[in-house]
């Protein structure tokens, strides 16, 4: 209650850390064998595990319009827009950015996509361009990245919803964003913006994976942080 930590508690924590290092042999051989990196890091087994974990964590928070799951192989034109977060790396093949990864994964289900990244704080010009592209699309998927801190992102979502086109909102970082555009009828939380999360999101959107994720936190109302908009543990399935 005082905010002070007893020395014996710190000592106990340090002992646990040192015991684990001893168990792992880090005192005898503390360095990484760089020649074995390719054998250990990024193996097919690791990628498969990451995909499975991502599939299980995507959370369908709202599906009020019954828009999901999407029907595959329709050839419909989908605008993939909004905030990114991941720009890819030099080792990536093709466009592995947040939106690029999502678009590519959606195209595997037989739709045509257009990517337009607006960034995490879109100005009026970028929002206007996104709206124009939305009006020429059959469906819009907009990603948000901590939109609760960005009025530009909040306005973007509201302006896209105002087009009358079907809009899917996917938070690619915190799930709290929904509190700032509660009129969105279709909302998911992906918790990540790298390719593995975007590929899992696409599988959920098209029903290849039935969403089983649950909110790990409560989403509070924007105007009253003590009131729950969606409670801890909430999550929908098909």
Model-derived features: positions:
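Preference for extracellular/luminal or secreted protein segments
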Residues: 1-238
């Amino acid at each position: 209650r005082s905010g002070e930590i007893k020395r014996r508690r710190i000592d106990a924590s340090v002992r646990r850390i040192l015991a684990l290092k001893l168990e792992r042999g880090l005192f005898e051989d503390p360095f990484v064998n760089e020649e074995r990196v390719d054998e250990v890091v990024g193996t097919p087994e690791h990628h498969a595990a990451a995909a499975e974990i991502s599939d299980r964590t995507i959370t369908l928070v709202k599906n009020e319009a019954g828009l999901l799951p999407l029907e595959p192989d329709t050839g419909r034109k989908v605008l993939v827009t909004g905030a990114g977060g991941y720009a890819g790396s030099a080792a990536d093949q093709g466009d592995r950015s947040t939106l690029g990864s999502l678009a590519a994964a959606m195209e595997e289900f037989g739709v045509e996509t257009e990517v337009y990244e607006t960034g995490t704080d879109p100005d009026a010009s970028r929002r206007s361009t996104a709206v124009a592209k939305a009006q020429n699309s059959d469906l819009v998927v907009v990603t948000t990245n901590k939109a609760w801190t960005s009025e530009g992102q909040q306005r973007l979502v509201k302006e896209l919803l105002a087009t009358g086109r079907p809009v899917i909102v996917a938070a690619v970082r915190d799930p709290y964003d929904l509190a700032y555009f509660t009129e969105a009828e279709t909302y998911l939380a992906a918790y990540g913006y790298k390719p593995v999360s975007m590929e899992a999101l696409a599988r959920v959107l098209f029903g290849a994976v039935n969403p089983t994720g649950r909110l790990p936190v409560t989403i509070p109302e924007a105007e009253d942080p003590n009131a729950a908009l969606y409670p801890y543990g909430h999550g929908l399935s098909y």
